[in-house]
Amino acid sequence: SEWIIKAVDKKDARPLWIAAWSGMNTLAQALWKVSHTRSPKDVDKFISKLRVYDILGQDDAGAWIAKNYPKLIYIRNKSVYGWPKDDEWYRKHVQEIGPLGKVYASRRWATEGDSPSFLYCINNGLNSPEHIDYGGWGGRFSCIRKENIESMDWVKKNNLDEMQYAPYLMYGASEEGGRAINIWTDDIHNDFMARMAWTVTNKYSDANHHP
């Protein structure tokens, strides 16, 4: 949480994207501390620099954040399945490519399941992160906040009650859902292959690069 605060406070006009691959308690702690140590004006300034991309919602802290900080740009994407390749693809094109590939772990659950949260911010000419309705490798989102987008089922099973914070508002996936990512599957993986090739290519001109 201290790192988040330090990163937001840097003299940098760019927004800070929080890619949430798990629970949101760390960001919640950062926001709580800032709220209890700064003026309302400075809290608003802090929040204005933050952007959140939450994969699936994996605890109840996201609902608490959305409820207590309604000015925060908060995306929760629950349409993130179906785009990764199979295990054989990752073995052939990643794990067998040089020293870096060797440390790429075999999956236990979903391969690259949370990756859309940072793929969304890759500057590939398709999207503009500040325009969530444009679409790109990380998906496309509604410009209208949706009410009470719930977390994964296991959050309820672990007796975490998001509805205590209802109503809370977040940006959610557009009507096309997971297809907004799935249509870019080949492009995402071609880019991944190229980057792996860079790790074993000594000369820049001998590898494939973007125009």
What is each of the regions a protein language model found here?
Residues 1-210:
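N-terminal acidic, glycine/proline-rich low-complexity segments
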